[in-house]
Amino acid sequence: MRTTILGLTLALLLTPSFAGEYQPVDVTKLPEVKQTKLGLYLSAPEAYKMKSEGGANLLFVDIRTKGEFQFLGTPTVVDHNIPYMEIDDPASWDKKNNRYTMSPNSDFVGAVAALATRMNRGKNDPIILICRSGDRSSRAANLLQEAGYTKVYSVVDGFEGDMSPAGRRDVNGWKNANLPWTYKITEGQAYIP
């Protein structure tokens, strides 16, 4: 038994780590695609802290596609999934970006408004948006700002984080910060238009 434990310990110590060390995001150097009109930004750890400390007063919305939400997991403190964009149905291919074509969810603002009403929140209450890496959440924040929402925060490193030079999402983000997340979602969190 002692030999087995020693062997497993050595194997773990000698195994290279595939995830990089979490790198905080410098919001003063955000690329244009992650900037919002309101200029309200949170890193994943800041979003977790804000929701944990003031969760009853704000909405935390995962705006990734239903597939991402269901199969890649979500922060445990997320209130609801409302996709900002969805993969087109029927599916088509985006040759420029080498992926399925995605289009904005025409129900996004209405679904956020309905969720806010159900949770007794108004347009001046804080909303946190999270996507994969911060690009979609910035565009969604701008859309909500145009609809009159005044405190929309974008999680600039998202759920999975930015891509490293090696092509993996292991730089930052919710998962790489080792914040609590789950594959278990509830019907109450699901986006069912």
Predicted regions and their residues:
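Rhodanese-like catalytic fold shared by cysteine-dependent sulfurtransferases
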Residues: 20-45, 50-54, 70-126, 137-193
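Positively charged n-region of N-terminal signal peptides that target proteins for export
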Residues: 1-4
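Short hydrophobic beta-strand that contains or immediately precedes a catalytic carboxylate
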Residues: 59-64, 82
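Glycine-rich nucleotide phosphate-binding loop and flanking beta-alpha elements
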Residues: 67
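Short, surface-exposed ligand- or partner-binding patches at beta-edge/loop junctions that are enriched
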Residues: 130
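Conserved G/P- and acidic residue-centered "switch" motifs that form tight phosphate/ATP-binding loops
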Residues: 134
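N-terminal signal peptide c-region/cleavage motif recognized by signal peptidases
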Residues: 14-17
